[in-house]
């Protein structure tokens, strides 16, 4: 039987370009966050921040940005430049971000599009993404994060080959699958409190420990270290 706890905490969540970058069912990550949040006594107030809208780095406790089709991602790549300064401020102030697929790419310097064009990201993180000719990384994937002692499961489907840069470390080491680029045995990224990944599934629906970790981090940022949360079954 599910037990909901009376809310003692609140988190404000920005779903960046949620009306455009929503192709792969990764909105399920927000459903998962809300599911666990209710069990932990947390109310999540979410809103979409899209094109022509300002991003306020002081308003939000959590940011989610997913992936989309090529056309929509190009639109977003142009608009997100107007949010570059505020997003970078949010990141450098230890704001929590979960970025998936195209959203992950856009936080870096650039990615190569379907027609070979170079599409600028915001360069808040030091990675870049190349493309593959007539090939995609597709299939089940499993990684292990040694720092947290956690294993994550998902499904990857991407043409991009992402290479991490200074200050970045992978979300995990490949146990099964291809990961960021098929070469260095890493998948995803962690930089400060930014988590990026190519995992679909959605990632949080299949990896409870990661979902709870993100919620804990956002709460500690907002309320300090003394956060009293119930243990989840």
Q: What are these model-predicted stretches?
A:
Residues 1-89, 205-206, 211-233:
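N-terminal beta1-alpha1 cap of cysteine-dependent amidohydrolase-like domains
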Residues 11, 148-152, 190-195:
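Beta-strand-turn-beta hairpins that frame and shape the catalytic cleft
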Residues 17-19, 159-161, 201-203:
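Glycine-rich beta-alpha junction loops
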Residues 46-48, 124, 154-156, 194-196:
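Conserved beta-strand scaffold positions in the cores of enzyme catalytic domains, especially
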Residues 62-66, 98, 196-198:
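Structural motif
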Residues 70-145:
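Cysteine-nucleophile active-site neighborhood
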Residues 114-187:
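Pocket-forming structural segment of enzyme catalytic cores
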Residues 181-217:
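A glycine-centered loop/beta-turn motif at secondary-structure junctions
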